Amino acid sequence: MASPTLSPDSSSQEALSAPTCSPTSDSENLSPDELELLAKLEEQNRLLEADSKSMRSMNGSRRNSGSSLVSSSSASSNLSHLEEDTWILWGRIANEWEEWRRRKEKLLKELIRKGIPHHFRAIVWQLLCSATDMPVKNQYSELLKMSSPCEKLIRRDIARTYPEHEFFKGQDSLGQEVLFNVMKAYSLVDREVGYCQGSAFIVGLLLMQMPEEEAFCVFVRLMQEYRLRELFKPSMAELGLCIYQFEYMLQEQLPDLNTHFRSQSFHTSMYASSWFLTLFLTTFPLPVATRVFDIFMYEGLEIVFRVGLALLQVNQAELMQLDMEGMSQYFQRVIPHQFDSCPDKLVLKAYQVKYNPKKMKRLEKEYAAMKSKEMEEQIEIKRLRTENRLLKQRIETLEKGQVTRAQEAEENYVIKRELAVVRQQCSSAAEDLQKAQSTIRQLQEQQENPRLTEDFVSHLETELEQSRLRETETLGALREMQDKVLDMEKRNSSLPDENNVAQLQEELKALKVREGQAVASTRELKLQLQELSDTWQAHLARGGRWKESPRKLVVGELQDELMSVRLREAQALAEGRELRQRVVELETQDHIHRNLLNRVEAERAALQEKLQYLAAQNKGLQTQLSESRRKQAEAECKSKEEVMAVRLREADSMAAVAEMRQRIAELEIQREEGRIQGQLNHSDSSQYIRELKDQIEELKAEVRLLKGPPPFEDPLAFDGLSLARHLDEDSLPSSDEELLGVGVGAALQDALYPLSPRDARFFRRLERPAKDSEGSSDSDADELAAPYSQGLDN
C-alpha cells in the first residue's frame, strides 16, 4: 500500500518559500566558469518555458526550497521568477543527474546546501543514495506478509512519532500504518539490528516525501551506506565513536564550555545522542530539520558534527551561566527554535566550524585501539577471576583432605613401628641361627677329636636343650609375627591406595617371603639337629664298648667319619641358605631405598615448582602496586594542573564577555547613527531635519553615558568567581559503556518523546519561583543579541 506524498506542515511551506536571509549574493562565491555556466542555464531555461511539457510541469503545485543561486526581485505571477528558475534548474539536474554528479559536483553541493525544493526531494534523495533500482524493492510485498519479533515495540513507539503531524495523528491512521509496514519490513531484512528507537523518525520523514516502497529502499540504503546501521546496532559502538569524536572537537574548539560541562557533570551523551540517532529530527522543527537532512544525504554524518558544534558556539555564553538542570531545559526549549525563521543562518554557522576528516579518522583509530585495550583488560580480569575461583576451590579441597592425610600419616607411623619390631625379631633369629651354626662347627671339631670326656658330652646335651628351647621361642615369635602381619594386611586393605601405602605393602610382602625362608631354614636346621642328636646318641651307645675287638673299632671309626662328612654337608647347606637369604634382604633394601629416593625427588620437584610460581606471582603483584602508585601520583598532578587551567580560562572568559557586551553597545550606537544619517539624506523637510539633529544630540549624550562606566560593573566580577567542583578522575566516565549507560537512554527518551504530565507539573513548579528573574535575563539577552545578529547580516 503506497502512501501519498505529503508536505511536512504549513510552517515548513512558509519557511521553504522564504528567501535567503543572508543579503550577500551566492554568485560571489562561484568561479568565473561556474558563473558562465549559470548564465547559459538561465538562457536555456527561458527557452524551455515555451515548451508545453515544461509549462505543464511548472503549472502544478510548487514550493520554493528557500534557496536560489541568482537573486531576483521581480514578480510577475503567483510564482516568482526566482522560483521558476530554481524549479527549471532542479528539473534539469534530475534529468541529467549522472552528468551533474561527474562534472558539476561542486556546483551541485552548493545547490544542495541552499536547499532542495520540496517537490524534488523525493527523486533527488533517491538519486543521492542510489536507491532508484534496488532488488529489495521487489521483496517488500512479501516481507509485509511475514511476522516480525519487533512488532510490539514498533506499535508502542509509532504513536509517539510525530504526534502533532496531521499525517501521523490518530490511532490506526494511514501514516501510522505505512510507518509500521516500513519498520517491520526492515526488521525482517536486517535481523541483527531489528528495530531501534529513533529510526522511526527518519522513516517518517521519508514517508512525508515519497511512497512507502521508495521510502523503504531509501531507508535500507541509508542504513547500509551512511553508518546508520552501526549507530542502531544493539551495542551502539558507532554512537560511542561519534560521541568520542564530538567531545574531542568540543574540547579543541570550545575548551571553556567543555570545562563547564564537566564541572556540572553534563555529559555529551545527555544532549548529543539524539542528534546522531535522529539527525536533528526531534530537535528542530521540520523545515529546519529537512534542510539538515538534505545536506546529510549528500555529505553524511559530517553535517551532524558541524551543526551540533555550531549550536554550542552560538549559545556558549548562555550555557556558561547555567547549571546542569538549567542546561537541560535550555537544550529542550530554547535551542530548537533559534533558527525557525532563517535556516540558512544555521547552515552558514555550521560551515564556519572547523572539521578535519583526517583528524576524525585518527580519532576513530584511537577509539578502536582504546576499545580493544579495554576488551583485553576485561578478558584478563575475567581470566584472573576464574583462576582465583579455581585456587579457592583447590584450597577448600586441600583443607578437607588434610584430616584424611593426618589419619593416614598416623596409621603409617604405627605400621612403621611394627615393621621395626619385626625386623628386630628377624635379626635376633638370624643371630640364633649363627650361634647354632657355630655350635655345629664346634661339634664337628670335637668329632674329629677321638677322645671325648663326659663333661663335654653333658655340655653338649645342655646346649642341645637350650637350642630346642630357643627354637620353641622362635616358632612362637614367628607365629606372633604372622598374626601381626595378617592384622596389618587387614588394616592396610581399609586404607586409601596411596603410593607410600603401596610401597609399605611391597615391603611387608618381601618380609613375609623372608620370614617363610627363615621358617624353612629353621625346619631344615631342626631336622639336621635331630639327625645329629640321633647320631650322637648312637655314638654314645658305642662309646661304652670301645674296648671291643679291632673290627668293631674300624666300623666305629668309619661311622665317625661318615658322621663328620654329614656334619660338614649340613654346615655347607646352612651357609648357602644364609647367603641366599642375605642376598634377598639386600635386594629388598635396595628396592625400598630406590622408592624412597624417587618419592623424595618428586616432592622436591613439586616444592621447587610451587616456589617458582609464588615468586613470579609476588613479582607481578609488586609491579602492579608500583604502577598503581605511579598512576595515582600522575592523576593528582594532572588534576591540580587542570584546576589551575580552569581558573585561568574562566577569568579570561569573564573578561571576554565584558568586552563583547561593550562592543555590542558600540555597534548598536553605530547602527542608529547610520540609520538616522540615511533618513537625513532622503528628507527635504527642514523641520524634520531639526528634529533629527535634536535626536542626534540626545544619542550622543547617551553614547557618552554608555562609554562612561567601567566594563566590569555587572555582577559577573572576578570576586564572584568560584570553582566549587573541580575536575577529578571520578567525574569522568571510565569507558564508553559507562558514558552511554549514564546518558544515552535518558537523553534519547527525553529528546524523542514529550514529557509525561507528572514531569511537566514538576518543571512548572520549578519555573514559578524563578519566573521574574528569567524574564528579565531573557529580555536582556534578546536586546543584546538582536543588533549583533543584524550586524552579522550587514
UniProtKB/Swiss-Prot annotation:
Residues 1-36, 49-75, 766-794 are annotated as: Disordered. GO terms for biological process: negative regulation of cilium assembly; positive regulation of GTPase activity. The record marks 156 as: Arginine finger. Keywords: Coiled coil, GTPase activation, Phosphoprotein. The keyword Chloroplast does not apply. Pfam families: RabGAP-TBC. The record marks 197 as: Glutamine finger. Residues 115-300 form the Rab-GAP TBC domain. The arginine and glutamine fingers are critical for the GTPase-activating mechanism, they pull out Rab's 'switch 2' glutamine and insert in Rab's active site. May interact with RAB10. This is EVI5-like protein. It comes from Homo sapiens (Human).
